[in-house]
Amino acid sequence: MKMNLDKLAGQYLEYLQYQRHYSIKTIESYNRQIKHFIYFLNQEAITDYNDVNYLMLRGYLTKLYEENLAKTSINHKLSALRSFFNYLLKEELILDNPFLLIESQKTAQRNPDFLFLEEMLDLLESIETKDDLGVRNKAMLELMYASGLRCSEVVNLQIFDIDLGQMILLIHGKGNKDRYVPFHEYARDWLINYIEEARTSLMIKNEGHNFVFVNKFGNPLTNRGVEDIVDRVTRHYDPTKKIHPRHSFATHLLNAGADIRTVQELLGHENLATTQIYTHITKDHLKEVYLYAHPRSRENKEN
């Protein structure tokens, strides 16, 4: 019967891949969460998903806490398993979904780290461009800040997705949703510099693809590769923050008065609530400036 648990899990992962067109990275994550739960079921001698109930899930939740998992990690598991059981219910393989009775764990909302405009410009100017990889890093972070790109979108960007004349990118976002995003002349100049010189030099070792950003061997950068570059560059500038150019992009647009719906479209957010995180940041910034600059506020601080 154990094979039945695994087999149904495999069917679900195929459904995500071929019908929902989820990314490989997302499918691998779902696979890990489901396997972890199947291991728990095996320990409890459960051989049928229909035997999973609310009390059992409370026990599973306790086990997750005993493993010292963060609440965000626990919520990630619950979300994946809730979706899996919804699939089983839809396919009439189970009678109900007990995960609907389990609430997500409350977490303290942490606003994304960002840099003020002057800081962001300083960071970009601090990037060394003495060699091909430095030019690549400069072009990549300039573009990420210019267009608010995710790391995965940088990875998937290909030469024919870039219109240098119109300064427009065709971005292949989450859930296979495409969008067009503009970029400015400064980012274009660095992009041209990188594509015509640094990338050409790096691609001598590998000419079999059209991906824009490559490693020292000419192979396309991976998600981890882009994340490492961003982390290395930003931590060199400010080791106290986990900075992403995308967060500063959104914050700076909203601070300058951009319409939130437009920012939502540029970021490729499905839900407006996700974009609204950045309005909280701008409110904090406005309050900070107010407390510092308003004469009455200064009086109170001095007294």
Residue ranges and their predicted role:
Residues M1-N303:
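Conserved catalytic core of the tyrosine transesterase superfamily
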